Regions:
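Detector for glycine-centered tight turns/loop "hinges" at secondary-structure junctions
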Residues: 59, 82-83, 129
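Non-catalytic linker/capping segments at the edges of enzyme domains
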Residues: 1-47, 51
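A generic structural signal for short beta-strands and their flanking turns/coil linkers
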Residues: 30-32, 42-44, 84-90, 102-104, ...
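Hydrophobic residues in beta-strands and at strand termini
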Residues: 48-50, 94, 141
Length: 149
């Protein structure tokens, strides 16, 4: 990812700690055991352990739990520029089952951004690098700063 900052092209910095804390305090994420690990402009990462309470009736990770992990990352990456962004569409593909005890790590990257919309790709992988799910997601970007939200 290119950085157009005036500091000579250095790697992008993480978002400010106040924004990170607000994104990390998502009540559903907390309930599901999802931990936001990193957020910087155009990138976010979170992880979730597939615990017994997150299994479906056939003993694999519930699709809703996996989708929630993708959505938490989508929210973080799309709000990483400091203004409020709201989801318009999230298309998810489930590629392989998450297994009991798996640590699923989801990473989201910015694909395209304008003043009003943005598109993100999010992938969730197990600790053995197995691709569990992927999403392509779009947001509407508001002018409202997170500080005022």
């Amino acid at each position: 990812m290119a950085d157009s900052s005036a500091d000579g092209g250095a790697a992008p910095r993480d978002v400010d700690s106040g924004l990170f804390a607000r994104l990390a305090a998502d009540p559903l994420a907390t309930h599901l055991g999802i931990t936001l690990e990193q957020v910087r402009p155009g990138y976010a990462r979170a992880a979730m352990t597939v615990s017994p309470s997150l299994l479906n009736t056939v003993g694999t990770a519930h699709g809703g739990a996996t989708m929630a992990l993708l959505d938490v990352v989508h929210a973080a990456v799309s709000n990483s520029h400091g203004t409020v962004a709201v989801a318009q569409d999230v298309h998810t593909e489930f590629c392989a089952p998450g297994r009991p005890g798996d640590v699923l790590t989801a990473e989201g990257t910015e694909v395209h951004r304008t003043n009003r919309t943005a598109v993100y790709r999010i992938e969730a992988r197990a600790q053995d690098d197995r691709l569990v799910a992927t999403a392509l997601a779009r947001v509407f970007r508001t002018d409202r700063p997170w500080a005022d939200a």
